[in-house]
């Protein structure tokens, strides 16, 4: 297989880059790792995007797809190339997907007129916040949409600090091109950009919801293996930690018990477990967990989750229940 090389971006002859008032045509040399079907293509880049954003010769990405990805800065053709996952070491996340790697020009220093730049950043921060709230988007939505459209995902914290003008002027200047392009995309006159934004966010929400459901299901399965018949207090605690309704957790354990072949005709006895006390003598125990993990119930005045290997075994209908050797952890879910 041929070795990989970085793609080169250079302006067409005759374009000096100074004083231009529109998209600048750029030539993108096809890297060796692209398909042979891909010929040298053209990418329209707005003046100042490369020099004004990258702190140096850094590699950024343009999402691949079945049709040309159009935005108000121009057209980035793609679709006939091999997919290649691109990533970089940065404090920000990278949009998960294949990219055409592009190398932008080195960064330009801040203009000498700092006061004018500061006023521009203040105006941009206000405009960003106003547009985002008008459209009903969260700060995380804006950051993800920027990554989906332009190849660089910005975190919710970054958008929040930009709107509050808590970033340094240099960092705000670096984010300026991407955020201005996003504002142009969601302009009320650009219906195509707004529709594309909605599609991107819908797909993102579906992925986040599916990921959250997988984490919850995996955690509930671990809990079931350790305690197939939790008490009402345990169910309430699980629901609180997983941010679920108590009825959903109770139904899940009931259905899982039926799948595992556990008897379910003694529901009345199961409902009275909390009133009659723990199923075995000793202090109140919610779940047998691996050593080192303890959760506290505020109403019990101490640790309610004890290590598995205690002096009192955990009986389940006359049989001892073994527990996995790994430490059980509850996922941290984001709203």
Swiss-Prot record:
Pfam families: Homeodomain (PF00046), Pou (PF00157)
Domain POU-specific span(s) in chain numbering: 113-187
Keyword ATP-binding: no
Localization per record: Nucleus
GO CC terms, sorted: nucleus
Tissue and organ distribution: Highly restricted to adult testis.
Start and end residues of each stretch annotated as Disordered: 1-23
SUPFAM superfamilies: Homeodomain-like (SSF46689), lambda repressor-like DNA-binding domains (SSF47413)
UniProt-listed PROSITE patterns: HOMEOBOX_2 (PS50071), POU_1 (PS00035), POU_2 (PS00465), POU_3 (PS51179)
Stored InterPro entries: HD, Homeodomain-like_sf, Lambda_DNA-bd_dom_sf, POU, POU_dom, POU_domain_TF
Main location: nucleus
Database matches in Gene3D superfamilies: Homeodomain-like, lambda repressor-like DNA-binding domains
Molecular function GO terms recorded: DNA-binding transcription factor activity, RNA polymerase II-specific; RNA polymerase II cis-regulatory region sequence-specific DNA binding; sequence-specific DNA binding
One Gene Ontology term from the biological process aspect of the record: meiotic cell cycle
Keyword Repeat attributed: no
Top-rank taxon: Eukaryota
Keyword vocabulary terms for this entry: Developmental protein, Differentiation, DNA-binding, Homeobox, Meiosis, Nucleus, Spermatogenesis, Transcription, Transcription regulation
DNA bind region: 205-264
Purpose: Transcription factor that binds preferentially to the octamer motif (5'-ATGTTAAT-3'). May exert a regulatory function in meiotic events that are required for terminal differentiation of male germ cell.
PANTHER family the UniProt entry points to: POU DOMAIN, POU DOMAIN, CLASS 5, TRANSCRIPTION FACTOR 2
Homology family: Belongs to the POU transcription factor family. Class-5 subfamily.
Name used for this protein in its record: POU domain, class 5, transcription factor 2
Organism annotation: Rattus norvegicus
Taxonomic placement: Eukaryota, Metazoa, Chordata, Craniata, Vertebrata
